[in-house]
Structure formats: structure tokens, C-alpha cells
Regions:
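Conserved, structured core segments of small domains
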Residues: 1-88
Length: 88
């Protein structure tokens, strides 16, 4: 059974806007594979977050570590298993 993982992305000093398009392509690929639930940027421009589905934390980490934000060092990514207790 897949679990939800919240991925928080915080921009680093190495951030370059040219990574945004490859990051969006990465997210579109996750969406097409049924692994992405939602994503978006923070309105203050410091980063963003997305929710992925994975079997366990190790699988979520492997998935997220292929994000161009991570591979280029543009953002620090933090992964939390997320247990939703209230939802609309």
C-alpha cells in the first residue's frame, strides 16, 4: 500500500531559475506515473512542496533524489511521511 510523503523544497544559494523547467518535467512524469498528488511553490519565493506516493520512506527518498532540484543542489529537500487526519 502506497503511503503519502510530503516533500519540502527550500532554495539554496546555488538555486538557478533554469532548474524550474526540468523540475516541472520531473513532476509531470511523477503525475503520469500516478506518484504525484499535488505540488506548488511558496508565494514568498523560498521554495515549494509536493506530495508523492511511495511504498516506504526509502522508496520515496530514491524517487525524490532524482528531482533536478536535488541533483543540481538548487534546493534542500526534506521528506516526511504524512498521515492525513482531516481532509475535505
Amino acid at each position: 500500500m502506497a503511503r503519502k510523503y510530503l516533500v519540502m523544497a527550500e532554495r539554496t544559494p546555488k538555486f538557478d531559475a533554469s532548474v524550474i523547467e526540468p523540475h516541472r518535467t520531473f513532476l509531470q512524469e511523477l503525475l503520469a506515473a500516478g506518484r504525484l498528488q499535488e505540488s506548488g511553490g511558496f508565494t514568498d519565493g523560498t521554495g515549494g512542496a509536493y506530495v508523492v506516493l511511495a511504498e516506504n520512506h526509502a522508496a520515496a527518498t530514491a524517487l525524490v533524489h532524482s528531482d533536478p532540484l536535488h541533483t543540481t543542489g538548487a534546493s534542500d529537500l526534506t521528506i516526511h511521511e504524512w498521515e492525513i487526519t482531516i481532509s475535505a
